[in-house]
Amino acid sequence: MARTAPTSNEERGDGLREKMISVNRVTKVVKGGRIMGFAALTVVGDGDGGIGMGKGKSREVPVAVQKAMEEARRKLVKISLKNGTFHHTVVGQHGASRVLIQPASEGTGIIAGGAMRAVFEVMGVQNVLAKCLGSTNPYNVVRATIDGLMKMSTPSEIAAKRGKSVEDITG
């Protein structure tokens, strides 16, 4: 059914890292027969906490990938990192996919599977522990990962909510 292409990692002149996660062959059934096409899923990151996801469809693979990359660039969001990892543990969800993302100590590396690994690599995360729970559909896993990252809050945001200083929060 769905074919996953090997992930490619490119860096363009604008300093953004691009990674193709999957390319699927899709079929539209019409009165005259079947129309074949391709759907591509990509992520783009700036290596400093910026991440964007895009999907594109077309009759040819390169056009689908290009559309996906353009959408990913438009949807770029910034996530706060702390020394190449995250501030706290978080769970993200999309559809039947749930992801658990935990900060890791220096030297751990990226311990995450498939689509999540691609997201962390283009973001510039060096140390993270992540687990995919439920569906492993690449689209849902990437959306769940970004959902979890959007839920992440910095110590300064938590301190502002509680009306305390950052030192009280970080201990």
UniProtKB/Swiss-Prot annotation:
Q: Which GO terms describe its biological process?
A: translation
Domain (S5 DRBM) ranges:
16-79
Keyword S-adenosyl-L-methionine in annotation: no
Which segments cross the bilayer?
none
The UniProt GO MF terms for this protein read:
rRNA binding; structural constituent of ribosome
**GO CC annotation, single:** small ribosomal subunit
User: Which Pfam families does the record match to this protein?
Assistant: Ribosomal_S5, Ribosomal_S5_C
Q: Which UniProt keywords apply?
A: Ribonucleoprotein, Ribosomal protein, RNA-binding, rRNA-binding
Similarity field: Belongs to the universal ribosomal protein uS5 family.
For this protein, the record's PANTHER family field holds: MITOCHONDRIAL RIBOSOMAL PROTEIN S5
The Swiss-Prot or TrEMBL note on domains reads: The N-terminal domain interacts with the head of the 30S subunit; the C-terminal domain interacts with the body and contacts protein S4. The interaction surface between S4 and S5 is involved in control of translational fidelity.
Its biological purpose is as follows: With S4 and S12 plays an important role in translational accuracy.
What quaternary structure, including any partners, is listed in this protein's UniProt entry?
Part of the 30S ribosomal subunit. Contacts proteins S4 and S8.
What the entry lists under HAMAP family is as follows: Ribosomal_uS5_B (MF_01307_B)
What name is this protein filed under? Small ribosomal subunit protein uS5
Identify the species of origin.
Thiobacillus denitrificans (strain ATCC 25259 / T1)
Taxonomic classification: Bacteria, Pseudomonadati, Pseudomonadota, Betaproteobacteria, Nitrosomonadales
